[in-house]
Amino acid sequence: MTGIKRPMSQYQDDNEWEDWGPSKSQLKRDAEALQKMGEEIVSLSHSELEKIPLDEELAEAVELGRKLKPKKDESFRRHLQFIGRLMRSRDVEPIVEALSIIKNRHSTVNARLHRLEQWRERLINEGDSALNELMSQFHELDRQKLRQLIRTANKERELNKPPVAYREMYQYLRGEIEDLL
């Protein structure tokens, strides 16, 4: 099969290559990204879903997707494609921002809980020095209660008893200073 050959100079002079827009592969990647975003939205809890700015049609599609949930079902896959198609005709930037806020909130909560666990370990292992440092940062804590929990947790550890005071200390710290971390 022979085609019409044009001299290379014609391609260099014309700007026809620039007017073509995104490639077919790029359009497919964009569609798959929107479909994955739709899957993330469908998997959110109801309270998180309320924070996502969805118009009525997209919200109905997401609710239906939540009902179709079985991931091995072909209808669920097709419905995710439908959600992606709906999102292609909308400004998805507010949706992306809301999703990132939700994701960051989860990581922030995990970091706070991890810091509480570190404080608990330091209190049990270092004793009064860690307690004094904690009290200097958080004045509202009950020093006597913390000392009692530290002593009890150390005794439980020595006697190989269940870590009741260990857990109680974590709950106390979480209740008193979680919002301040």
From Swiss-Prot:
Gene Ontology cellular component annotations, sorted alphabetically: cytosol
Gene Ontology MF annotations: ribosome binding; rRNA binding
Pfam families recorded: DarP (PF04751)
Highest taxon above the source species: Bacteria
Free-text function comment from the UniProt entry: Member of a network of 50S ribosomal subunit biogenesis factors which assembles along the 30S-50S interface, preventing incorrect 23S rRNA structures from forming. Promotes peptidyl transferase center (PTC) maturation.
PANTHER family assigned: UPF0307 PROTEIN YJGA (PTHR38101:SF1)
Family: Belongs to the DarP family.
Name listed for the protein in its UniProt record: Dual-action ribosomal maturation protein DarP
Gene: darP
